[in-house]
A protein has these predicted regions:
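Hydrophobic helix-and-loop "lid/oligomerization" segment in the mid-to-C-terminal part
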Residues: 1-126
């Protein structure tokens, strides 16, 4: 069994509990900047994996500050290719695990992600 720092564990739990369900199939959440010393890309990946445990969630996205950029970690199951989504945001990855790094705020990253998802849904790309 893997164990976590209690503060990091509680940050992950908070992020999961505050997730927004977008377009009925996509979970989006953020990690707070005030605990940035505890947040790493692995933290974001753990949250993204946890969000996939919910029924009807096809893909999950976690936006968080890391080393003066905003990271988006993406995970998926079923038929959603998160690599394609992250490529639209300047990132990359694999079918079920991908990421992007943006030069903006967390809120702006969430907005860009939602715009990208909306466009891709309308165009039948996802």
């Amino acid at each position: 069994m893997f164990r976590s720092n209690p503060t990091e564990y509680l940050l992950r739990a908070q992020a999961v509990s505050q997730a927004e369900i977008f377009e009925c199939s996509y979970a989006i959440t953020t990690l707070p900047a005030d605990n940035s010393s505890l947040i790493t890309p692995a933290t974001g990946a753990k949250v993204a994996n946890s969000l996939l445990e919910m029924d009807n969630i096809k893909a999950s996205f976690v936006c968080f500050p890391y080393k003066s950029q905003i990271y988006i970690n993406a995970r998926s199951i079923d038929d959603v290719n998160v690599q394609l989504i992250m490529e639209k945001l300047g990132g990359g990855g694999h079918l079920s695990a991908a990421a992007a790094q943006l030069e903006c705020t967390v809120d702006e990253a969430v907005d860009k992600l939602k715009e990208t998802l909306t466009t891709m849904l309308k165009e039948g790309e996802i």
